[in-house]
């Protein structure tokens, strides 16, 4: 095996310094790239994902985690590419075009709800998150019902 360029590194060491290596220690969202049901996990302990996962670090990451895990978040990603077996392919490129409004007034509330959901994992907290996200998108009761039924039916068919 021949190196691409001359370095003092051994063959198994990276030859190029990656500029984003510090992001692995920041609060982030980690998710599996391929799957039938979407789950976005919040990490603030510096965990690392496997090679089949993606991660995103940055501002308002708890807020984003709530939106992506909501019924509306799942609905926004419904048109992501799929595998031959129908599983979703949700890479960073699939999430970037999603229109996610940022409303600062919900930032602290969603952060608190995420903490509560992580520690307790209740349906009531999940509903509260979904309701806030529906309000952020300005959905009518009929639109909320449509999104809810669509996501639940698609999850049942998986």
Predicted regions and their residues:
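Polybasic, glycine- and aromatic-enriched phosphate-binding surface used to engage nucleic acids
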Residues: 1-108
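Non-catalytic DNA-recognition/assembly elements of restriction-modification systems
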Residues: 102-158
């Amino acid at each position: 095996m021949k190196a691409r360029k001359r370095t003092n590194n051994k063959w198994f060491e990276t030859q190029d310094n990656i500029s984003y290596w510090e992001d692995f220690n920041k609060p982030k969202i980690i998710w599996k790239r391929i799957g039938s049901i979407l789950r976005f996990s919040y990490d603030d302990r510096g965990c690392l994902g496997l090679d089949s996962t993606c991660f995103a670090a940055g501002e308002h990451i708890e807020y984003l985690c709530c939106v992506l895990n909501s019924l509306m978040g799942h609905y926004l990603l419904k048109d992501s590419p799929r595998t031959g077996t129908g599983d979703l392919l949700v890479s960073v490129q699939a999430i970037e075009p999603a229109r996610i409004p940022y409303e600062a007034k919900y930032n602290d509330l969603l952060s608190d709800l995420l903490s509560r959901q992580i520690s307790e994992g209740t349906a009531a907290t999940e509903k509260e998150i979904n309701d806030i996200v529906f309000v952020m998108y300005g959905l009518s009761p009929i639109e909320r019902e449509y999104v809810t039924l669509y996501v639940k039916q698609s999850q049942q068919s998986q």
